[in-house]
Amino acid sequence: MNNIIPTEETHPLTWRLRNDRETVWIEEYCKKNGYFSLKKALKTMCPEDVVHLIKESGLKGRGGAGFSTGLKWSLMSKDNSSKIRYLLCNADEMEPGTYKDRFLMENIPHQLIEGMLLSAFALNVSRGYIFLRGEYIKAEYILKKSIQEAINFGFIGSNILNSGFNFELFLHTGAGRYICGEETALINSLEGRRANPRAKPPFPAVFGLWGKPTCVNNVETLSNVPSIVLHGVNWYKKLSKSTDTTGTKLMGFSGKVNNPGVWELPFGTTAREILEDYARGMKSGLFLKSWQPGGAGTDFLIEKHLDLPMDFTSIAKAGSRLGTAIAMAVDNKTNMISLVCNIEKFFSRESCGLCTPCREGLPWIVKILESLEKKEGHKNDVKNLERLCLDLSPGKTFCAHAPGAVEPLQSAIKYFRLEFEAGISIKKLKKCSNILGIQSNEFTSKV
């Protein structure tokens, strides 16, 4: 990566980065072809053209779900009787270990703003919000300044570039809840309500913010739109090495690697390339024990999966999810029970409490893991954990919080079951075996 010079043709998201890593403000952004796509769209395209272009490009959501962006846009209500529609940028990046959206907002904020302008034009939207994670203080300052710059240059406001297109953009900082990454919880929070997910249908495209048609897209997703509009579908598709997904993606590795970071790479780049060529391998004296492909809420994979292409289908076939594609390396000296317990504490604390399986199941999982960590577990603890994974699986709760929370647990048991079984207390096992009278059925045959 260090020997590769990013260009507009190969690195559409990051080629404008400064060598000193300072923010690219509007004057420099305009000198680097900034807002060219907006001018092209407003002068030569209609909104339907932009929607069709994005659909043909194959752009998929970069927040983790990987849903087709063009298809999502086409689901927006076609009823033009209501002139109020909203575009929301999901910048509530609270996935542990993930920092790609912050990277884009702090370094190239106008790329996101231009992407929102193009998306708003395509969707006939005149008002947008950036819902920003509250802890991103630096990004908040940069985005506020950048929005004002765009207003001063006439890119935000009324009759933009004499096209008749109007757009207002507001920045909203969240109060710090993981669940706000779920789009309907985000909408509730923006309305001033408790951030609980909503029942679907109706979907936000029909009944969203304040009951109006609303589209919610991720920061990185929106940041891809300007280059697609400027350079076209065929160029964008050829960027990828994958047959599954088009374009490039911000990918990275964290953990005890020599060079943790994030890089823009073509879809289809293998995890091994990212770990060894970009993150420069594990630190001295350590080797890779396991890894999560895209955030704390994705299943663990092991060393044999490193040669898989990083795209949505290949990682799913291996039993995990691409997620945010910011991977975490787990070294051989890390206790899997302690690691998973830490992850589950986070998800338990961040549960909104609306669904019983999630509200009660996650704290129960934490208690069992704490017991196993102290070597004080009961004989059936591992089986109970597996049963809880099923009870919190997709379809059992209102949103994807609980299913995501149990993904690291179920995969850790799958690959490192002996570590979990080693947490069962031998003393308790013997004590139970010696009880005469009332005792659990599991020990009856041994008495």
From Swiss-Prot:
Q: Which reaction does it catalyse?
A: a quinone + NADH + 5 H(+)(in) = a quinol + NAD(+) + 4 H(+)(out)
Q: Which coenzyme or cofactor does it need? A: [4Fe-4S] cluster; FMN
UniProt cofactor note:
Binds 1 [4Fe-4S] cluster.
Q: What is its EC number?
A: 7.1.1.-
Tell whether Translocase is among the UniProt keywords: yes
An MF annotation (GO) of this entry: metal ion binding
* Protein residues bound to NAD(+): 61-70
Q: What does this protein do?
A: NDH-1 shuttles electrons from NADH, via FMN and iron-sulfur (Fe-S) centers, to quinones in the respiratory chain. Couples the redox reaction to proton translocation (for every two electrons transferred, four hydrogen ions are translocated across the cytoplasmic membrane), and thus conserves the redox energy in a proton gradient.
Q: How does it assemble?
A: Composed of 13 different subunits. Subunits NuoCD, E, F, and G constitute the peripheral sector of the complex.
Q: Which PANTHER family match?
A: NADH-QUINONE OXIDOREDUCTASE SUBUNIT F (PTHR43578:SF3)
Record-given protein name: NADH-quinone oxidoreductase subunit F
**Corresponding gene?**
nuoF
